[in-house]
């Protein structure tokens, strides 16, 4: 009986250890953090300051809030809600593995409020920025 209890204790300890490792395994790098119900993302641009009429790169890291893997079915875009139009360019997104993505083809052609849209699997996340 004691042997069975010890086995159950070891199993419970292993489950707790594995759960804590899984929960901390996905850490987001510094950047702008955006949350949805099932996903946390961090994104940053290169260069860090977006200038009107200048191309930039966007990098994004995603961490699921569940045990599900991050989908590589993604689409990134931006639009100007007040003007009801988007960019004049289509972005290209390359999955880098491990929930990380590299995206090129960004250019904001006019100043004002832009809204990034990040579609990752079935999750839709948005974040607004003001470009002067």
Model regions: which residues?
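Bacterial N-terminal signal peptides
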Residues: 12-22
């Amino acid at each position: 009986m004691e042997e069975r209890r010890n086995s159950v204790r070891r199993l419970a300890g292993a489950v707790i250890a594995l759960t804590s490792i899984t929960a901390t395994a996905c850490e987001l790098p510094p950047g702008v953090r955006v949350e949805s119900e099932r996903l946390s993302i961090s994104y940053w641009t290169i260069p860090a300051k977006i200038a009107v009429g200048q191309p930039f790169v966007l990098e994004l890291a995603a961490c699921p809030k569940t045990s599900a893997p991050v989908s590589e079915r993604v689409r990134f875009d931006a639009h100007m809600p007040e003007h009801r139009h988007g960019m004049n360019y289509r972005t290209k997104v390359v999955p880098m593995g491990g929930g990380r993505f590299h995206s090129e083809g960004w250019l904001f052609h006019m100043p004002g409020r832009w809204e990034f849209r990040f579609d990752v699997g079935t999750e839709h996340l948005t974040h607004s920025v003001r470009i002067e």
